[in-house]
Amino acid sequence: TRAATGTAATPISAPFSMPEGCERANRCPPGVVEDDLTWWHRGGLDLIGPVLVDTHVSERRRELRLITLMTDIVASTGKGPEAGIGLDETSALTVRKQADGLQLEASGQSGVWWFEAPDERNDVSGWTLRGHYLAPGAIARWWNGRIQTQGNEPAYMVRNSRMLDGGDALQAEGLRTALWNMARGGYAGTALDAAGLRLAVRTTPETHYWQGPQGQQGLTDLILELSPKSDRRH
C-alpha cells in the first residue's frame, strides 16, 4: 500500500495536506480538495505485506502526514497497516524476505523511517507509536511486529536527561535534524512544535544507536507522542 491520490480521502488540517496544484490545474478527483489527504485504498503489489510507503518524507516534512494516515485508516476501517515506511529521494531500503521475517538495510545519503502501527489516539489530535530511524551501516530484522538490529550496535547511552528543543516538526527535514542532534548530544529525547501541538520523541531502554558512513544517525525503538502543546509530560 502506498500514499497516493486515490478514491478514498480523509480530510485533515492544512499543515499535513498536499501542496497546491490540483485545483489550479482542474485535476482534483471528484469530491476531493487540496486540503484532503488521500490514499489508494486498493493498495500496491503487496510484496512485503500490509505496509504503507511514502516518499520525500523528511525532505518535505511528511512524517506526521504518514502517521496521521496510518491512524485514520485504523479509525475508518478498523484495521491499519502493520508499518509505515518513509523514504527520501536520496535514500533507499532493501528488503529481503526471510523465513523468520524481513531483513532491512538502508542505503543512501540519509536513511529511512520505519513506524510501527500506532496505538489508539490518546485524544482528539494525539497518538503514540514506536518508530525507528534506519541509517546506513546496520542491518535490521522485522519480525512479529518489532525491529531488531542484527549486528553489534550498542545500546543508546543517555548523557543528558533533558529533552532537546527540536524546533518545528513541520519544517523541511525538521524532525530528522532534531533526531540527529538529539543523538549527537546524548539527550533523552527531543520535543518539537507541530501546528499548535507538541511532538515528543523519547529514547527507551531498548534503543540501539549507530552512526552511518556519512555521519547519519541510526536509532531504534523510539517512542513518538503527539499531544496538546499544553501537555508537558516528560
Predicted feature residues:
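Catalytic nucleophile loop
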Residues: 1-12
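C-terminal and late-domain segments of enzyme folds
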Residues: 17-234
